[in-house]
Amino acid sequence: MIIGIDLDGVTYDSQDIIRTAAEIYDVEHKGKGVVNPKSLYVAEKYDWTKEECMTFLKDIVWMYTFNAPLKPYAKYVIDYLHDQGHKIIFITARGAYSSPHEDVLTKKALEKDHMHYDKILFAQTDKVQAIKDEKVDIMIDDSLDHVKAIAKAGCKVIYFREQGSPEFKHKNVNTVTNWGEIYRIFKTN
């Protein structure tokens, strides 16, 4: 089986770093404060322009790319899946919005964390196309927008739902909140 896995918010717990850094960035740059408190995206939450968001991401890319901790048991479950003969492809939007060196930093972080994978695809803002091109059987992602698009395209997806993220029901979607639940899905099916 070919398994696609997102990095930020799924493999790495980078979301807390991004949320905290965004709050500090907005204060330091005399932003408007929180404008849309329910938004999960920093640009919408603080009503930043595309340029402001790009500047923010470029400023913090090294921090979340290399310093974000792995989600609990992510390595254990990914190693298990890899050892079972599954092909692991990391499919990430990293590199689409920030530093041109984010791919190098990401590969170093994966190496530092001794992560097993077969391939990594960067700057994938259209994950549906990447999934189809790579013939991915199931994708693990935390972005509701990606989950909806993947499910509607007929692909199976595991929605790694963060606290506060909206629910989404679809015949192609399994919803989880941690890597133990992902392990159960693969171990019992």
Residue ranges and their predicted role:
Residues 1-52:
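Active-site neighborhood of HAD-like aspartate-dependent phosphohydrolases
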Residues 45-61, 86-88:
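Short, basic/glycine-rich phosphate-binding loops at helix/coil junctions
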Residues 64-69, 74-106:
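Substrate-recognition element of Asp-dependent hydrolases with the DxDx(T/V) motif
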Residues 87-89, 117, 155-157:
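Hydrophobic anchor at the start of a short beta-strand
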Residues 95-138, 144-148:
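Substrate-recognition "cap/lid" segment bordering the active-site pocket of phosphatases
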Residues 106-121, 169-189:
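Structural recognition of alpha->loop->beta junctions
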Residues 139-174:
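Acidic, Mg2+-coordinating phosphoryl-transfer loop and its flanking beta/alpha structural elements
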